[in-house]
Amino acid sequence: MVLSQRQRDELNRAIADYLRSNGYEEAYSTFKKEAELDNNEELDKKYAGLLEKKWTSVIRLQKKVMELESKLNEAKEEITLGGPVSQKRDPKEWIPRPPERYALSGHRSPVTRVIFHPVFSVMVSASEDATIKVWDYETGDFERTLKGHTDSVQDISFDLTGKLLASCSADMTIKLWDFQSFECIRTMHGHDHNVSSVAIMPNGDHIISASRDKTMKMWEVATGYCVKTFTGHREWVRMVRPNQDGTLIASCSNDQTVRVWVVASKECKAELREHEHVVECISWAPESAHPTILDATSSESKKSGKPGPFLLSGSRDKTIKMWDVSTGMCLMTLVGHDNWVRGVLFHPGGKFIVTCADDKTLRIWDYKNKRCMKTLCAHEHFVTSLDFHKAAPYVVTGSVDQTVKVWECR
């Protein structure tokens, strides 16, 4: 490739600047003489540091080209696999495929949580920018922002009807929103530190929250009163989730344990300790997963009649563990993420586990065979949260890169 005279002059000035600013005086004066460069302070300023800038931008572009090439190859592979095969594949086995259907921008800080609405074709994201945003996942349209918290929104949860949304924040409050009028109808105070997790109980009458103050609290939806406090964790409680019928709640903590509590008595039924670092996330197994879990493990529950309940946990030790709550046994450990695990979920069909982590990936696990069957490079930064739609073929992820991505499953 031949350079024009102007490009040649620019390159010569940039080389001269590089030689001079790095102390190669002899080479600089020789080069200046041979390249016939005149003394021009204005031009010298213009080309200061230009060679280094060009060099680093070339490296950046090369990296981008390589990324795009690998995405292109992945997409080609998907087309050859995804076409006719997807018609034959059972929807229970559909998994997210690259590239993402939508990458949605709007948050001004890391996204902390993403969830689907149980009825409408919308999803909701929470962020460190203190806002909650509502998006249409079918069109990718932004719908509205809910404002009210004064610090990072840490978690959000719908009731089963989708009429109420609960949110919690580092501002130490829990808010309840009417999801039809989008008004905040109640604010609950009582925790002494950052409220890291919230969930509306299956009966819709109570909310459970977890905090950096080491406690979990249960609140009455109708009055906003705190009716129960669960204590036992020795450190920050990261996440709390009720089981399907609301009789048990699971919590995980910086104390490296997962605990299961009986709601009625506030008693800690099980303390699960095998993780070697902070436990970031937990998820209950749906009944659709029980047959595969029993196949995959010689679970004690087989002998005792009714299986389970089973629980997943993800940790900063980079592993995912599956637990039989009735025995307190760890049934399996899945290893493959290269950084902290931030989200764990069972596929609605029950055969797979879906996880996200600070290694920027979304992974799908065939847990019966204890193998990672697909890895998607999901975001430019840590992936903080994921949700799998219960009925429609979509997965949503949120990231420190401030985006929300919608992935189609097939």
From Swiss-Prot:
Dimerization mediated by the LisH domain may be required to activate dynein. Residues 32-82 form a coiled coil. Pfam families: LisH_PAC1, WD40. It comes from the Eukaryota. It is found in: Cytoplasm, Cytoskeleton; Cytoplasm, Cytoskeleton, Microtubule organizing center, Centrosome. Can self-associate. Component of the cytosolic PAF-AH (I) heterotetrameric enzyme, which is composed of PAFAH1B1 (beta), PAFAH1B2 (alpha2) and PAFAH1B3 (alpha1) subunits. The catalytic activity of the enzyme resides in the alpha1 (PAFAH1B3) and alpha2 (PAFAH1B2) subunits, whereas the beta subunit (PAFAH1B1) has regulatory activity. Trimer formation is not essential for the catalytic activity. Interacts with dynein, dynactin, nde1 and ndel1. It comes from Tetraodon nigroviridis (Spotted green pufferfish). GO terms for molecular function: dynein complex binding; protein heterodimerization activity. Regulatory subunit (beta subunit) of the cytosolic type I platelet-activating factor (PAF) acetylhydrolase (PAF-AH (I)), an enzyme that catalyzes the hydrolyze of the acetyl group at the sn-2 position of PAF and its analogs and participates in the PAF inactivation. Positively regulates the activity of the minus-end directed microtubule motor protein dynein. May enhance dynein-mediated microtubule sliding by targeting dynein to the microtubule plus end. HAMAP family: lis1. Its main location: cytoplasm. WD repeats lie at residues 106-147, 148-189, 190-229, 232-271, 274-333, 336-375, 378-410. Residues 7-39 form the LisH domain. One of its GO terms (biological process) is cell division. One of its GO terms (cellular component) is microtubule associated complex. Keywords: Cell cycle, Cell division, Coiled coil, Cytoplasm, Cytoskeleton, Developmental protein, Differentiation, Microtubule, Mitosis, Neurogenesis, Repeat, Transport, WD repeat. InterPro entries: Dynein_regulator_LIS1, G-protein_beta_WD-40_rep, LIS1_N, LisH, PAC1-like_LisH-like_dom, WD40/YVTN_repeat-like_dom_sf, WD40_repeat_CS, WD40_repeat_dom_sf. Belongs to the WD repeat LIS1/nudF family. This is Lissencephaly-1 homolog.
